[in-house]
A protein has these predicted regions:
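Glycine-biased, small-residue-rich flexible motifs in mid-sequence functional cores and linkers
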Residues: 1-315
Length: 315
């Protein structure tokens, strides 16, 4: 890909794989705005938030000198998830794809904390958009803090499990992020004097600071400590499984009715969403969405609202 992107000012955007449509929409908005402001956005090419971030960045104004970098958990030539094959191709042409793993190596759960460390290390700040209490995105946030980077979190409804991670980060001192302006204002002092803005095309791997411990085993220990903290928190919500372990849980996804219902439910949050937007986000036929919503409504999982909107019912 375009290796010169590695020398440009970057911001990491990470979040849930089972992100809601509203969460993905906000991720796209942030990504597009940051790229238009001249930043490179960095993410992990996973489902959900990551994919939305990369897709929006690729559509941003090319004259703004933004761009996007995908950090993979396997070899740089291994496409995961499989449905991101087209996105991978576009990233190789218009963005940059990197990995510290050898070519051909299939992704494994233990690789993802190391990938997350690279995402935060490349970035002046890391933004978490929707993440469960046990999400692997919180590993990226912790790495960012240890590396001296800013940590931003997008707040969410306390009734949505996917807001537990960002809300917790905000309580712990992360910067509340409700627009790209918050990020740009916070990072302006950090970037206004750097030579990175003066010569976008000079590849300089020494531009990032501060220096951090690069011992891979250390990052495995950090990841394990986060997992342990999550287990001790007493959260038993099925959707809150540790995402660094579940990244590989569906290499061969099926398309059964149960899978489609789960996909629709994952896209919904307690904030009402237009059914038309749900159809676009799910990429399912309108008649299938209609049937699924009826089933979920009868099961007490979703609620309809005026204006052809629907929301998930909090448990």
């Amino acid at each position: 890909g375009r290796v010169e992107l590695l020398a440009r000012p970057a911001i990491g955007l990470v979040g849930a794989r089972n992100a809601s449509a509203n969460g993905c929409g906000f991720a796209r908005k942030l990504s597009h705005s940051l790229c238009d402001a001249g930043y490179v956005v960095v993410s992990g090419m996973a489902r959900g938030i990551d994919g939305a971030v990369h897709e929006a960045a690729l559509k941003a104004d090319p004259n703004a000198h933004g761009g996007t970098i995908a950090v993979l958990g396997g070899g740089v030539d291994v496409i995961y998830p499989r449905e991101h094959r087209d996105l991978y191709g576009k990233l190789c042409e218009q963005g940059c794809v990197i990995s510290e793993m050898p070519p051909g190596l299939q992704p494994q759960a233990r690789h993802f904390p190391r990938r997350n460390r690279i995402i935060s290390g490349l970035s002046y700040g890391t933004v978490v958009i929707e993440a469960g209490r046990n999400s692997g995105s919180l590993i990226t946030a912790r790495f960012a803090g240890e590396q001296g980077r800013d940590v931003f979190a997008v707040p969410g409804s306390p009734t949505d499990p996917r807001a537990a991670g960002p809300n917790s980060l905000i309580r712990d001192g992360a910067i509340l992020c409700d627009s790209a302006d918050v990020i740009l204002d916070a990072l302006r002092d950090a970037t206004q004097n750097t030579h990175l803005f003066e010569d976008f095309h000079q590849f300089n791997t020494n531009a990032r600071s501060p220096e951090v411990n690069s011992d891979p085993a250390r990052y495995d220990d950090i990841a394990q400590s986060i997992v342990q903290d999550a287990e001790n928190s007493g959260s038993k919500e099925p959707s809150q499984s540790i995402e660094i372990d579940s990244e590989l849980g569906d290499l061969s996804p099926t398309d059964t009715d149960a899978d489609q219902s789960g996909k629709v439910l994952d896209l919904l949050s307690t904030t009402p969403l237009l059914i038309d937007d749900l159809i676009r986000a799910s990429e399912l036929p309108a008649n299938s969405i209609s049937s699924i919503l009826i089933e979920l409504e009868l099961a007490g999982r979703v609620e309809r609202h005026p204006g052809n909107r629907v929301s998930r019912i909090a448990k």
